[in-house]
């Protein structure tokens, strides 16, 4: 028992030193303080509509892009609002080309896949 306590006595300072040093290395010197979301919104020069998710300046809320357009579809709902969903995962190159197309992708309704057609059905209570 005494031997294990003695070993712990020597290892503890080394372990705590490692974690202390680890935290110090993760602090970047000369890094500018992060600007808060509120400051970004309040100090924005947008004269039209500022999209809340992306802080993109557009003419109307209907023109807001998805935060991750490479991996998301922008699905317009019947009430004019929109939701962003992940593009369906598929290994079919033809389907991927459709979903990557900014016009065809949001209009697609392929049975068995959760795309914008599925979102429309869910909105209407069909799913």
From Swiss-Prot:
InterPro entries: LCL2
Biological-process GO terms, alphabetical: ERAD pathway
Coiled-coil boundaries: none
Keyword set, alphabetical order: Signal
Keyword Protein biosynthesis applies: no
Signal peptide coordinates: 1-17
Matches recorded under CDD domains: LCL2-like (cd23996)
Function: Probable component of the endoplasmic reticulum-associated degradation (ERAD) pathway.
Protein family according to the UniProt entry: Belongs to the LCL2 family.
The protein, known as: Long chronological lifespan protein 2
């Amino acid at each position: 028992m005494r031997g294990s306590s003695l070993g712990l006595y020597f290892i503890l300072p080394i372990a705590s030193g490692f974690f202390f040093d680890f935290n110090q290395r993760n602090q970047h010197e000369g890094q500018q303080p992060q600007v808060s979301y509120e400051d970004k919104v309040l100090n924005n020069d947008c004269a039209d509509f500022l999209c809340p998710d992306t802080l993109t300046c557009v003419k109307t809320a209907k023109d807001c892009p998805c935060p991750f357009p490479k991996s998301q579809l922008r699905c317009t709902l019947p009430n004019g609002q929109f939701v962003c969903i992940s593009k369906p995962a598929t290994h079919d190159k033809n389907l991927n080309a459709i979903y990557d197309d900014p016009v065809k992708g949001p209009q697609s309704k392929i049975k068995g896949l959760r795309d914008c057609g599925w979102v429309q059905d869910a909105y209407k209570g069909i799913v």
